[in-house]
C-alpha cells in the first residue's frame, strides 16, 4: 500500500480579469492511495507465471477555485484506476505479458436542467436551477466520489460510458528486446479517444529506449500518427552493478 500526499498550485489565469472579476491562483491539497498485489504460481507448459493486480485512487483533495469573489469551487479530477496483468514465462527467455485497465472519474456528472419554451433554465423559489434528470452536483468531495457511480442523467448506460478501458500485450526476449501492442477506448459521448498503439524497446545494461506509434481509429483525430520516444535509466540495476564491482575490488 502506498500513500502519496501532494500540494497543488495552479496559476492558469495569471491574475486576468474574467467577467469583471479578478482571478487568482488555485490552491489545493490532495493525495493518492495505491494498492498492489503480485503472486507467482506454476502453470502447465510454462517455466513460471505471475498474476498482478493494482488499484489507485488519485487526486483526492479539496475543491479548487480561481476566483476569490465566487462561491463556486470545482472538484479535482479524482480518478479510480483498476489494473490486472498476467505474465507468462515460457522458457526463461521468452515472456508474454497481457494487461487490462479501467479508469473512472470520481466526480459528479453534470445533470440536465429543466428549461422553458425559450430554452432558458428554470429556477425554483430558492434560486437554484431545477434538475430534470440526474443529481445535484453541489456536494462534498466524499459524497461526490460516492455519487459519481449513480448520478449520470442517462442512468446505468451513461455510467458505463464513463468508464475508460484499455488492453495491452508485451512480448520480451531475455528482458532485452520488447514488442508491444495496445488499445485505448473512451466512449464517443465522453471524449471519443480511441486508438491503437504499437511499440518496441531495447534494453542494454542500465539503459533502455522505447518507441511507440499511435494509430487513431477515427479520422481527423488529434492523436493520430503520434510518435513517442522514451529513454530509461535503471537506478536499481546501476546500484547493484556498483556494489558488485566494489565487492570484486575488495
Predicted regions and their residues:
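Outer-membrane beta-barrel porins/channels
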Residues: 1-250
Amino acid at each position: 500500500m502506498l500513500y502519496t500526499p501532494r500540494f497543488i498550485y495552479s496559476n492558469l489565469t495569471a491574475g486576468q480579469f474574467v467577467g469583471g472579476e479578478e482571478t487568482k491562483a488555485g490552491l489545493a491539497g490532495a493525495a493518492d492511495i495505491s494498492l498492489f498485489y503480485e503472486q507467482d504460481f506454476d502453470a502447465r507448459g510454462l517455466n513460471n507465471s505471475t498474476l498482478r493486480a493494482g488499484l489507485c485512487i488519485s487526486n483526492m483533495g479539496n475543491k479548487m477555485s480561481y476566483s476569490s469573489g465566487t462561491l463556486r469551487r470545482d472538484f479535482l479530477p479524482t480518478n479510480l484506476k483498476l489494473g490486472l496483468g498476467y505474465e507468462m514465462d515460457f522458457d526463461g527467455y521468452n515472456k508474454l505479458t497481457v494487461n487490462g485497465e479501467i479508469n473512472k472519474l470520481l466526480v459528479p456528472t453534470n445533470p440536465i436542467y429543466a428549461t422553458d419554451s425559450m430554452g432558458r433554465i428554470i429556477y425554483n423559489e430558492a434560486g437554484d436551477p431545477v434538475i430534470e434528470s440526474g443529481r445535484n452536483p453541489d456536494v462534498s468531495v466524499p459524497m461526490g466520489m460516492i455519487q459519481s457511480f449513480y448520478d449520470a442523467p442517462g442512468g446505468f448506460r451513461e455510467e458505463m460510458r464513463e468508464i475508460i478501458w484499455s488492453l495491452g500485450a508485451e512480448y520480451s526476449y531475455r528482458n532485452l528486446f520488447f514488442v508491444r501492442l495496445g488499445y485505448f477506448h473512451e466512449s464517443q459521448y465522453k471524449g471519443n479517444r480511441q486508438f491503437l498503439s504499437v511499440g518496441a524497446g531495447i534494453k542494454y545494461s542500465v539503459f533502455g529506449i522505447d518507441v511507440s506509434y499511435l494509430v487513431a481509429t477515427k479520422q481527423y483525430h488529434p492523436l493520430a500518427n503520434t510518435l513517442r520516444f522514451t529513454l530509461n535509466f535503471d537506478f536499481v540495476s546501476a546500484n547493484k552493478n556498483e556494489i558488485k564491482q566494489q565487492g570484486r575490488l575488495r
